[in-house]
Design a protein with these regions (language model features):
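Pre-Walker A (pre-P-loop) alpha-helix and adjacent loop at the N terminus of AAA/AAA+ ATPase modules
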Residues: 22-55
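Conserved ASCE P-loop NTPase core motifs with emphasis on AAA+ ATPases
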Residues: 2, 6-31
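Conserved small/polar residues in nucleotide/adenosyl-binding loops
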Residues: 297-304
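Conserved alpha-helical scaffold flanking the Walker A/P-loop in AAA+ ATPase domains
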Residues: 102-120
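Canonical AAA+ ATPase core
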Residues: 142-219, 227-232, 275-277
Length: 304
């Protein structure tokens, strides 16, 4: 019996939709590049995660534009943004929100925490106690929060960008494997190159780096982004590439050089990321190179 590969692994994407998507993504990347010097790889990976409906763990020292990248991206895609700084004394209610009695109405009002946004920047996630981390990871996994018997669901556009300092720094703790598995990708933001740093200095010297985010106009609306994101479901993946992903995962589980093999969740993450990354490159089909590229970041998140 002949199998319909399009039905199994993706449908044909109309060229008009693909062209519109490519134009929007190129404009988005261009606008980010006009504000942030370098970090093109990081920008591609963050956009890939958003398109794949996943979360990102970003490791890097302070001062490499992690916060600016998150705020700017949210602004350009017309998304609600929030930020929470994780500290050793942070409580779950500081992240999720809390119920407060309103004496005027004689009722309890729920005050939403920072997790109720579209793009959430969680700074220094590896400085918070385990209980607070667990509250966040439950929301990441379930995309909903249960507070005082009421369940609050997150919107369709929901990506957490969590940053962590290198574990060698004082007061940091290595995240457990089960928690790393909640991230689609792990990215390391490097220092700028010499030429990039000179460019940064020139921008600051001439005040060209002074950008008011509130004055920046979105490139795309949330509704448009969600509509275009559905194109990832139509990206074609040949059966041989599915076998390729499965083979990679199997080999990590038998190799003595790997501490903990890739889980099935990691295999799915690799597939989702590869489809989104292919679309970001203007293609409606996945290549082996897409998988090899995404492997560097999806496997690191799941099996660090």
């Amino acid at each position: 019996m002949e199998e319909n590969m399009n039905d199994m692994h993706g449908e044909e994407t109309p060229r008009t939709d693909l062209t519109l998507f490519s134009e929007k993504m190129q404009e988005l990347k261009s606008r980010i590049a006009s504000v942030i010097v370098g970090q093109e790889r990081t920008v591609d990976l963050v956009l890939t995660a958003i398109l794949a409906n996943g979360h990102v763990l970003i490791e890097g020292v302070p001062g490499v534009a992690k916060t600016l990248l998150a705020r700017l991206t949210a602004r350009l895609i017309d998304a609600d943004f929030s930020r929470v700084q994780f500290t050793p004394d942070l409580m779950p209610s500081d992240v999720l929100g809390t119920t407060v009695f309103n004496m005027k109405t004689n009722e309890f009002d729920f005050h939403r925490g920072p997790v109720f946004a579209n793009i959430i920047l969680v700074d220094e996630i590896n400085r918070a106690p385990a209980k607070t981390q667990s509250a966040l990871f439950e929301v990441m996994e379930e995309r909903q929060a249960s507070i005082d018997g009421t369940t609050y669901r997150m919107g369709g556009l929901y990506t957490i960008l969590a940053t962590q300092n290198p574990v060698e720094q004082e007061g940091t703790y290595k995240l457990p494997e089960a928690q790393l598995d909640r991230f689609l990708m792990k990215i390391t933001m490097d220092y700028p190159s010499l030429d990039e740093e000179i460019n940064i200095l020139e921008r600051h010297h001439t005040n060209a780096a002074l950008v008011k985010l509130e004055e920046i106009q979105p490139v795309i609306t949330r509704e448009e982004l969600l509509s275009l994101r559905r194109l990832t479901e139509k990206v074609f993946v040949d059966r041989t590439l599915l076998q390729y992903i499965a083979l990679i995962a199997q080999q990590t589980r038998t190799s003595k050089a790997v501490y903990l093999g890739a889980s099935p969740r990691a295999s799915v993450a690799m597939l989702q990321a590869s489809k989104a990354y292919a679309l970001l490159q203007g293609r409606d089909f996945v290549t082996p190179e897409d998988i090899k590229f995404c492997l560097l970041y999806t496997s690191d998140a799941a099996d660090d």
